Amino acid sequence: MLDMRSMVTVHPALIAKPKGKTVSGDGADPKKRGRPKKNATEPAVRNPVTRAGVTRYMNPLVESLVRDNPFRGDNLVKESLLGQTLAEQTLVRANSRDNLLKESLVEQSFVDQTLQDQSLVDQSILRESLLRDNPRDTLRKESLRKYNSRANPLAESLLEESTTPKPRRGAHRKPLVLTKEMEEKLEALDRDMRTAEETKVSIAGSAGIPVTALPGMEALGVMQMVSSLGFLDAGDKPNVIKTMVVKYLDVFLSMGCSAPKPCLVNVPRGYRRFKQSSSVSPAYAAKLSSEDTEAWSGAAGVAVEAKMRHTAAVLESRNLSLEPYGSNPIKLERSALAAYMELMSMAEEAEGEDLEGIISDCRVLRTSTEWCRDLSQTVSSWWPPLREAISRRGTALSDYVSDREVDVIRGRSRVPALSCVLLYGKRVDDNDAPLTAPQTVLKPFDVTDYSRRLGGVWLHHARFPEYAPKRLFDPRPGAEPVLIRTCAGYLMTEERGPLRCWRKDAHMYQISLEIYNRLTTELNAVPPQTRCGRYNAKWLSTNGPTGVQKIVLAAARALTEPRLSWNDVFEV
């Protein structure tokens, strides 16, 4: 290869010509593309050759050097064609001095080129002989071809590629040579796996259960024995023995001797430590969960007592006396309902200030005992007398009900179905059937149920607050509003422990999908031109589509009670 720097006669400005530049010496400067470089000082003289009064030319040899440069990875075909045409043009315009220079340089380059070609040929011959005489490589190829059941075309192509010489990096690994023993072992392994699979399928067929429901490999021998004894008849009637054998076989097996644990010697140390430290014995897990429930029931009891005290204080401030209810919220609700009915019946013949006092007392009774009622109790017991009173007297709604209740009745709440039931006693679709089956029955207050609900944020009757769509994502960091923290409650399902994996568990995945959909519909309920809508859009753009999931997951981890079912919140 000619050394570019040795050619003193040719100016470097002429060697590497960009594609856009004109070769002809007409001096028409092409337009500069793109931005000008910062701090780029313009040279005083653009082209020293033109300044010296030398005619501008492009040497065909230099052109060919630029064209045939093996270190340029551009589109070589296009460039070579371009270079040929350029060379022809320049040859036509060449003068005698050019020709002299060209001849001397051509001779030099020709000598160098022949030397280079010779060395390349020698190298390739040497490489071919090496490849031909390498016994290990041929062995590997032969073994792969012989057992083509294990070698796929991809491996073949990879093998072919690997024979081409590449600059080696790092330690040189010897190519794998399969010995006879290795091949026998592989065949035996294949055979064993096939037979195990067949056994599994046959057992599953005789037991009449899906293959996926079968116990582990260590139980297969026993299963085979049991199926050969004829226990597992594939009958239509459910067979108690069969189900017991299938269900509890691996339990029985693990009682006698536990399955051999995998040896973790060769596994990296961090993983080994992690596996060793993350095992929890069943007894310890049970102890933890019992402590957990005790702590929770204690906290719930404290919360209920505080509520009772607050209700008693409110009723006392209004001079309302109920039947003695002790510390039982169920009795409190019943006695409050009795007093409420009595007051409502008194309101029929009362007038003027007496009527106003009675109505406000009724309102206090209803709103202060909200926490110890279920939605079904509200719908079936507390609202009918109120509806009758409103329809009987033409007084304003605001006399009878609080502002929040007015919002619910008028359908301004987040749950239009609920307001429809409360107002008209029927569902939205004009169906006279009750709202749902369990809500026709009076459900007593349940302390354990209430303590479960305290795991999330307590929203009365699980209605989303009115500001939920506006403030779904509060612009202040770390101030996600109630809705999301409540939604996190549904990620905890009945008796399943805290959230595990986002994707692996189908049930959890469905629930999280549902939450995600609800949250996004809430988000879309706000028009983006409003202030909160802009906040939402900004939040979403910064946090991406997984931001919602992250918030929900974080809130779910923050919850200390894992036994919330998602019926606890979506009961409407």
Curated annotation (Swiss-Prot):
Residues 177-204 form a coiled coil. Keywords: Coiled coil. Residues 13-45 are annotated as: Disordered. This is Uncharacterized protein 079R. It comes from Frog virus 3 (isolate Goorha).
